Regions:
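A conserved ligand/cofactor-binding region detector
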Residues: 1-536
């Protein structure tokens, strides 16, 4: 006999994907009800659909009431992870978007790309960069706007010349394409009109990406971007508390806007972000910042390094790392033996046998998506990095690691892409950089955080990353794929060499690191995309 009457089934089908199976999707429209249902689920022997009929169907405010009681009265934060929201933010600066993307857990992001989309278009006669509130009401307003306008002017007027240079240096005639019969042919040998159009599309996309890659170095951190965010309620609440407590007016204003929009979908989950509890958290975070500033003034001395570098500053002896990795590799399948005893057993294995074990696990990886087992999380590395800010933005997307960064400044000099020199605009490029530096130094004296907005992507930026070998494998293999930006490919390759030097045995697990240099990085990727498009 069915658990539900026909009338109940009819009602339930508006909120669940089925009424008679043990696996079902929760499709009730309100996120707060979805989360509350799952949370109630853990404290009753009723089925979820029965809970819905008994408690939620007749009371439209049941979910809100539940969260108000659980979150405010009991402080059970984990229940806020059971509901989520999706928001889009358009027209925020690269300073603000990085602050948002600093949050690692509970979020997924997708940001507007600087290699596929150009920033040359104006809105109402103005380039798309943030007119930061505190700067614009200061005596630096004109200097700031003029510096950003200069960056965009040079960027805009050189898009077509850069595209022309890249296409002259790397002609479409040099490349092989698949025709409709599946044969590889040089472009001049293609006959079919559709094949010709298809291959021109591939080439145009790849060359445009390379041109924009080179020119993005000119863009200032004030450049406006768009980002889509999916996250759970708890993550959003923490993000909002951080942004409400920010020293930057743009970030505080964004916090208000995000909160207003989330109140329409997951209000119960973000209620505390700026109430008395949220403000206590904001004070705590600002106290941490103040303490760090004091300690820095007390104990840190030296001059900023010029140029870029990658240093491996912390790692363990490979002998110890191998023992821990192998112990973890066999732990799950071991016959009820505790980890410390397994470690003792592994230490007695001859080194040659240990090398064979690591090589075995490397051998069974057939592509880079075959992640190494979790055992390879047992050893980690700390890298000290100084790379251009544009490149940092790509590495910043990796979240299964510890990344700390400093304020964006002009202290570390800047990187000039080879294509800028080849195009003959190095002088103009340098003038942009020097102008930004001069304006930055003036703003910095009174508004050090706000001064970041005028700094170009080309300027070198300091940060460190601590990551385990499993995550290092993912990051380095992904960031050395042929279609990757030259800047981050080279940094990832250097990271690999440093790991290989210190851990020659364990580094064998990094099987899919591409050390080759490519002229037109996006070409093969665009070819694969076009071939898939043809099949659909």
């Amino acid at each position: 006999m069915s658990e539900f009457t026909d009338y109940e089934k009819k009602k339930l089908l508006k909120h669940f994907s089925n009424t008679d199976k043990s696996v079902f999707a929760i499709i009730t429209p309100r996120q707060v009800d979805r989360g509350a249902l799952m949370s109630r689920y853990s404290r009753t022997d009723k089925s979820m659909r029965k809970i819905f009929l008994d408690e939620f169907l007749k009371n439209k405010n049941r979910g809100e009431e539940f969260y108000t009681r659980v979150l405010l009265e009991y402080g059970d934060d984990s229940v806020a992870e059971l509901g989520g929201g999706q928001i889009a933010i358009e027209g925020l600066s690269n300073i603000a978007v990085k602050k948002i993307e600093d949050r690692r857990i509970g979020f997924s992001y997708l940001e507007k790309s600087s290699r596929y989309v150009s920033w040359d278009k104006k809105i109402n006669g103005a380039y798309k960069f943030c007119r930061e509130h505190d700067i614009m009401k200061s005596s630096f307003a004109d200097l700031y706007v003029n510096a950003c306008n200069l960056d965009f002017d040079v960027y805009t007027k050189n898009i077509q010349p850069m595209l022309k240079l890249i296409r002259e240096n790397d002609s479409i005639e040099n490349y092989n394409f698949k025709d409709k019969s599946g044969k590889n042919k040089k472009f001049p040998d293609l006959i079919d009109k559709n094949d010709i159009k298809s291959e021109q599309r591939i080439y145009n996309a790849a060359t445009k990406a390379k041109a924009l890659d080179a020119l993005r170095s000119l863009l200032p951190a004030s450049t406006l971007t768009n980002v889509g965010i999916t996250g759970n309620g708890r993550a959003f609440e923490y993000l909002l508390s951080i942004m409400f407590g920010s020293g930057l007016s743009e970030e505080r204003e964004l916090a208000s806007q995000i909160k207003n929009e989330l109140d329409t979908t997951i209000k119960s989950f973000v209620r505390r972000s700026n109430d008395k509890y949220g403000q206590v958290l904001q004070k705590y975070l600002n106290d941490i910042k103040k303490n760090s500033v004091k300690l820095s003034k007390l104990y840190v001395s030296g001059k900023p390094t010029k140029g870029s570098f990658v240093k491996l500053v912390s790692y363990e002896k490979e002998k110890d790392a191998i023992n821990n990795v192998i112990s973890a590799l066999i732990y799950e399948q071991s016959p009820s033996i505790e980890f410390s005893y397994i470690q003792k057993n592994i230490k007695r294995i001859p080194r040659t046998e240990k090398i064979k074990i690591i090589n075995q696990y490397a051998k069974i990886r057939k592509n880079r998506r075959h992640r190494p087992p979790r055992a390879f999380e047992m050893t980690d590395y700390t890298f000290d990095l100084l790379t251009n800010y544009g490149m940092f933005r790509d590495f910043h997307r990796h979240r299964a690691l510890t990344l700390e960064r400093q304020l964006l400044t002009t202290d570390h000099d800047y990187h000039t892409p080879n294509e800028i020199v080849e195009l003959g605009i190095e002088k103009e490029f340098s003038e942009c950089m020097e102008n930004s530096k001069n304006v930055f130094e003036k703003i910095r004296r009174k508004l050090p955080e706000q001064a970041q907005y005028v700094v170009n992507f080309a300027y070198n930026y300091p940060y460190f990353m601590k990551l385990n070998l499993r995550e290092a494998t993912h990051l380095i293999e992904l960031r050395t794929v042929p279609q990757g930006h030259t800047d981050y490919r080279r940094i990832a390759q250097k990271m690999y060499r440093l790991i290989e030097k210190k851990h020659p045995i364990l580094s064998k697990i990094l099987k899919y690191v591409d050390m080759t240099e490519y002229e037109l990085e996006r070409f093969e990727s665009e070819k694969r995309t076009e071939e898939k498009r043809k099949k659909t």
